[in-house]
Regions:
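Alpha-helical transmembrane segments of integral membrane proteins
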Residues: 2, 94, 98-131, 171-314
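Cytoplasmic-entry segments and transmembrane alpha-helices of multi-pass inner-membrane transporters
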Residues: 2-7, 11, 118-154
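Hydrophobic alpha-helical transmembrane segments of membrane transport/permease proteins
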Residues: 16-66, 163-179
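Hydrophobic alpha-helical transmembrane segments of multi-pass integral membrane proteins
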Residues: 17-21, 106-110, 149-156, 283
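Hydrophobic membrane-targeting alpha-helices
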Residues: 21, 25, 29, 122, ...
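Transmembrane helix irregularities
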Residues: 30, 142-145, 247
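An internal, D/E-rich "acidic patch" concept
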Residues: 60-117
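Membrane-water interface segments at transmembrane-helix boundaries in multipass membrane proteins
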Residues: 136-198
Length: 314
């Protein structure tokens, strides 16, 4: 286990190196350096000589690889440059958005677990009954509705009509995060309860369930001690992937509710061509998915002892 984790961590080094190279190259391909962008933002008109002098002062006249390694050295010391728009350090700007994103992620995941797992189990246990059909219908509707439409519905009924929650998220609090979290939880629950149902149905068809029933073991005991334990690998995989998506920010939902998280920050940066912020966001997304995949692989060994971390199942 320890050797596998160490080997995977070593494999992350070239991946992260490639991510930094591609994200830095992306900014160069964009065709607008810090001097040009600041000039556009401030409305200044500089002569070509002054532009070249400013680029030389910032080292932008040097070869691409030289600029990259200088930037990489600063990055390793926590210096990601300054925003083109606010002139604030990118690292500080990014860190200031993380609490909102973390709160939205945790709240959405908890709501998804509370909704999808019980309903998925109930749908499987009550297969081909009215209960099963109603749950599957709700899942179909939830999958069909886009997030922006659900956001507007919740905003109209819960905020404008019933006035339970604020229309706009003014701070990072549970009351403000409620509607964005419910919106995301509806979409994820609609998708995941079908997966939970399919996994539980697969376990119900296996011989050990019939054997337990023949021995007089209560179904509730078999369900929670055997069936759910065998289904955990699928459930954990789905939840870990959702964590990756949510930590990367949910741009549409955050923008609608003005939730000041990473996703909204990325949308604002794209609209204002704030390339250092975009660059930091791209690296954050890539790192999150790499780390989440690693943690998912490591969790398999704890959830199912039959799985060997080399990819072979005993």
């Amino acid at each position: 286990m320890g050797k596998y984790a160490f080997r995977r961590l070593l494999q992350l080094i070239p991946i992260l190196f490639a991510i930094t190279f591609l994200s830095y190259g992306m900014m160069r391909i964009a065709g607008s350096d810090v001097v040009t962008q600041k000039m556009e933002n401030t409305g200044q008109i500089l002569s070509e000589d002054k532009l070249n002098a400013a680029r030389e002062q910032l080292g932008l006249d040097k070869p691409f690889l030289t600029q990259y390694f200088v930037w990489l050295g600063k990055l390793l010391h926590g210096d990601m440059g300054n925003s083109y728009v606010s002139s604030l350090p990118v690292f500080d700007t990014f860190i200031s958005k993380l609490p909102a994103t973390l709160l939205l992620t945790v709240t959405s995941i908890l709501l998804t677990i509370i909704i999808s797992i019980p309903l998925g189990i109930l749908s499987a246990v009550k297969q081909n009954t009215i209960t099963d059909y109603l749950i599957r219908l709700c899942s179909f509707i939830g999958n069909s509705l886009p997030n922006f439409f659900v956001s507007l519905l919740l905003m109209y009924f819960l905020a404008i009509r019933l006035r339970i929650f604020p229309v706009i998220s003014k701070d990072v609090s549970l009351k403000s995060v409620a509607m964005p979290a419910i919106t995301l939880a509806i979409a994820m629950s609609a998708k995941y309860l079908r997966q939970v149902r399919a996994t539980v149905l697969d376990e119900l068809s296996k011989d050990y369930v019939a054997g337990a029933k023949a021995r007089g073991v209560k179904f509730s005991v078999t369900l929670w001690k055997s069936i759910m334990k065998a289904s955990l690998v699928t459930i954990i995989t789905l939840l870990m992937l959702s964590v990756g998506n949510l930590l990367g920010g949910t741009a549409i939902v955050e923008s609608i509710f003005l939730w000041d998280g990473v996703g909204k920050m990325a949308v604002d940066a794209i609209s204002m061509r704030d390339y250092p912020i975009i660059q930091a966001y791209v690296m954050w997304m890539a790192i999150i998915y790499v780390v989440v995949n690693l943690l998912t692989d490591l969790s398999y060994r704890f959830l199912d002892p039959r799985i060997r971390l080399g990819g072979v199942k005993q």
